[in-house]
UniProtKB/Swiss-Prot annotation:
Catalyzes the hydrolysis of N(2)-succinylarginine into N(2)-succinylornithine, ammonia and CO(2). NCBIfam families: arg_catab_astB, PRK13281.1. One of its GO terms (molecular function) is N-succinylarginine dihydrolase activity. The active site is at residues 174, 249, 370. It catalyses: N(2)-succinyl-L-arginine + 2 H2O + 2 H(+) = N(2)-succinyl-L-ornithine + 2 NH4(+) + CO2. Substrate binds at residues 19-28, 110, 137-138, 213, 251, 364. The lineage of its organism: Bacteria, Pseudomonadati, Pseudomonadota, Betaproteobacteria, Burkholderiales. GO terms for biological process: arginine catabolic process to glutamate; arginine catabolic process to succinate. Pathway: Amino-acid degradation; L-arginine degradation via AST pathway; L-glutamate and succinate from L-arginine: step 2/5. This is N-succinylarginine dihydrolase. It holds the Pfam family AstB. Homodimer.
Amino acid sequence: MQATEANFDGLVGPTHNYAGLSFGNVASQNNEKSIANPKAAARQGLRKMKQLADLGFHQGVLPPQERPSMRLLRELGFSGDDATVIARVAKDAPELLAAASSASAMWTANAATVSPSADTHDGRVHFTPANLCSKLHRAIEHESTRRTLRAIFNDADRFVVHEALPGTPALGDEGAANHTRFCADYAARGVEFFVYGRSEYRRGPEPKRFPARQTFEASRAVAHRHGLAEAATVYAQQNPDVIDAGVFHNDVIAVGNRNTLFCHQLAFVEQNAVYDELRSKLTELKADFNVIEVPDAQVSVADAVTSYLFNSQLLTRPDGKQVLVVPQECRENPRVAAYLDGLTSHAGPIDDVLVFDLRESMKNGGGPACLRLRVVLDDAERAAVTQGVWINDTLFGRLDTWIEKHYRDRLAPADLTDPQLLAESRTALDELTQILGLGSLYDFQR
């Protein structure tokens, strides 16, 4: 049966703001306390989804999570009605209100790790929501993520949505941002590639400036849970020096698709050995392996971090050629722009580059790859997905109108104290679940 890759992008939520919550994420820290535009952010992401759908890619949407998270604030000891809780947190612990209000669930590359049915022990698609335990504002996401995934992938004969791994530093899991899959064809068995920043129990190099968020132990646990064959699984350590330079996830320094890996020269520890293991295991599956390694002399790690060259989507078009989806910051960096011009002028796996304005997300450290969760589906599996989440002309129009109706065009950190923002968000999300056909997804609907 034929299979293709679908991308499920996160729809930016109404509380999108710049609180600078993510230590190790250079853009997040640099833009702390800036004025955000949630309406523009949501529309920028939606336009990317629509353009890719128009090009023939299977494109779905994942809804925002409810924010601010009143559950978190009440669990932390604040009581009273919603307005009273928000006022008390704003006065006593504004950093907790910022964490509870973050729209970071829009970066669905961190939502889960996904293994397609061709790779798993039981022939079903497996999802493990990421515990994201390194950051408070993200550690509160996984329960809602699991609920959302189960609403969309609700056929138990075809899909398994697990619980997140235990939320301990030893099992720190950041999802698909540290995972990719290589194969000759999407329907064929592939090699799954897990990248970690440190190991809890093994000796090895670690970053000194910024934390490594993904552990080897978490990656191995996900592979075991999904029933992946050891002969078709590769683990690699991310270069700790690039983590210290702001590469907080592997998808800021590398991206893969089918049999192609596009990465920076300094992406991994023992990089050539990583290539050799991937090539060897793919050869066993009768698949070729292509590496496009970007020299540090042409594009530095600093350029990669500011432009998000590697936080791109590498997609296979219906005609079999590959296209690289990059943020407009890549065209604004002269060295990165020159590299991309050369990349497509030579005969190689990547035939074209598409450029998108994702400025609102980029200012928080999220490019095209951050905004999407990849799910390989065969024809029957795709038909089993809740159909209301697929982007088409009708859904695009309804979502665009919904954004115009419900989203603010200006949100400063001080605005998070406004209890009306919670009311506005709940009204918007209640309508959204009806648009997408997802039922009572949120706590306030139950």
